[in-house]
Amino acid sequence: MFWIVLAIIVSTLIGLYSERRWPDQAGQASRRSLVLLLYVILPPIIFVNLVHVEFHGGVGIGLALGLLAIGLVGLAAWVIAVPFLKLPRQVAGAVIVSSLLANSSFLGYPMVLSLMGGDDLSEGVVYDVLVNGMSLMLFAFAVGAAFGTEVGEGASQRVKAFFFRNPLLTAAVLGLLAPDALAPGWLVDASRVLVALIMPLGFFAVGAVLAEEERAGTIRLPPKLHRPVVVVIFTRLVLSPGLLILLTMPFSGIPPSYYLLAAMPTGINSMIVGHAYGLDLRTTAEAIVYTTTIVVAAVLGYVLIT
């Protein structure tokens, strides 16, 4: 776990420094790293780990309740941001999106593999693809379209992109349909080596994007803690795992990786949605910084204690 924390810190700092030192090249490199993750590294990890998943009762129930919990988190974020705090429209949308989207791939996969093991990673991949994937493609894009200041693509285009231009969904479907012979043990082991590449690439991109937003005047580093970010900290890190625990209490056999992934910090995808629809990027960027810092500090404390 110490190496996970170190990788997060070092990768983010390299991204920050690179963007400040070579702004054009670093920005391009950060986007290429996200493309590499999306189209090259994550699909085979998802495929080979889903081939061997067995959907016993606890898995299916956990997935259904995970979707319900995410929906309730989004609703709670809306209640706090809109009727209660009366935040500006684009800020409220950023709060809701940042509450919905977890960093379950870049940070979640390595943490599940390190803390729990390979079998739990396979079940965690299912949760990530189905629960967090639906949260991104359906919930977050819908919120962006409803609250953003810029006109996004229409609903029909988003649906087509979800089904036909989503390599993670394609890999998931193929993995669920494929026979076990297509994912022998050595290939599963190799996929877990690829997991080690996710975090440095992902957090390099986070650091570069944050520095880019600072250069553009969107945020200041270190960011100031303000009310919208406090809401995200509560909904993402407290309410999300808390609701899943509460909803699953009557049931047994829920994979433990579900709870860990439900407690992951705000994902970089919140900034992607914010860019696309004109949400407040300061809020999304600061939510990433603060929620990730809290989770990393908690992990570091766990490492020191154990």
Spans of features found by a protein language model:
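Alpha-helical transmembrane segments of multi-pass small-molecule/ion transporters
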Residues: 1-306
